[in-house]
Amino acid sequence: MLLAIQYPSWLHPEIIPGLPFLRWYGLMYLVAFGIAYFLFSYQVKHGEFERYSGCQKAMTQDDISDLFIWGILGLILGARIFGTLVYNPETYLKAPWLIFWPFARDGAGNLTFTGFQGMSYHGGFIGGFLGVILWTKKSKFKFAAVADLMAVSIPLGYTFGRLGNFANGELYGRITTSKIGMIFPQTPISDRFYLAESWVRDFAEQAGLLVQDGASMINLPRHPSQLYEAFFEGIILWLILWLLRKKKPFDGFLVCVYTLGYGFFRFFIEYFRQPDANKGYPISFGTGAANIYVYESWKNISTGQILCSLMILASLAAMLILYLQEKKLKEKKGNIDG
């Protein structure tokens, strides 16, 4: 008996099979941006921007729309450039025009529409961050105050971005015999396993898979790590920030909590997620470092975990600096009032 969850048979990358330009991935991005826009507008409409940030300049709906244009543009550019040049530089440094080329050739050599697959969260974070900085400089708003509102607005939308990855059958986890494992039908041949290897047959048996007569390869169950990320980095992180939004001690606190929380959750979920084959483990002190498809040791650190560690350290440093600045301002104000 199969001891894994069946991937939904009705779910395909295309919303309507045969219409490649209508894809769940793109739709989920639109939903994510829409949710972030709604939550940001909600906070501004209810006076939370002025009340909890100390910012005296009112923000209009036109300001919000302009901000999101800058932020989304920075996010998309950063996510795509970072995702291609950091994770697959060999291909894109030779042909940089492919970075924004939404087509690829399938196994038969036919040109097919794929959209912008290979969007890096960390690149999107940096790009969106820079976009918001540029907008606040242009519009004369306090960056830390605006960033706090963005931090509260983003995670719930991010949830749908990961659901888009799930619909694409990409960014899946490592193989597992757990009952919450899932067989992704879109798994390419390069990520399937040869039945000639005894450990593969044993693994398939533990997972309750039936091996077809004459089959040479098998698609093993994997952790649906996209759903883990959607839940922890999306829903849970959003709930934490939503509850803290009226209790922040200083401007910039919430964006630091967001960066810290995302880095923390993602670091541990990376142990379930399969690293990029061309990157493997940049840091490996544990056993089985060559086997990226199965968890061997917590000492094997992926590129994603290195980037998350930098996020955690940067958020802690920024939080300390902002706290000391706020403390200094209060002391200065107290001396003046005294």
Curated annotation (Swiss-Prot):
Membrane topology, as annotated: Multi-pass membrane protein
Protein name: Phosphatidylglycerol--prolipoprotein diacylglyceryl transferase
InterPro entries registered for this protein in UniProt: Lgt
Keyword terms of this UniProt record: Cell inner membrane, Cell membrane, Membrane, Transferase, Transmembrane, Transmembrane helix
Locations listed in the record: Cell inner membrane
Residues noted as binding a 1,2-diacyl-sn-glycero-3-phospho-(1'-sn-glycerol) in the record, renumbered to the chain: 162
Gene Ontology BP, a term: lipoprotein biosynthetic process
Family: Belongs to the Lgt family.
PANTHER family noted in UniProt: PHOSPHATIDYLGLYCEROL--PROLIPOPROTEIN DIACYLGLYCERYL TRANSFERASE, PROLIPOPROTEIN DIACYLGLYCERYL TRANSFERASE
Pathway: Protein modification; lipoprotein biosynthesis (diacylglyceryl transfer)
GO terms, molecular function: phosphatidylglycerol-prolipoprotein diacylglyceryl transferase activity
Source organism: Treponema denticola (strain ATCC 35405 / DSM 14222 / CIP 103919 / JCM 8153 / KCTC 15104)
Keyword check for Transmembrane: yes
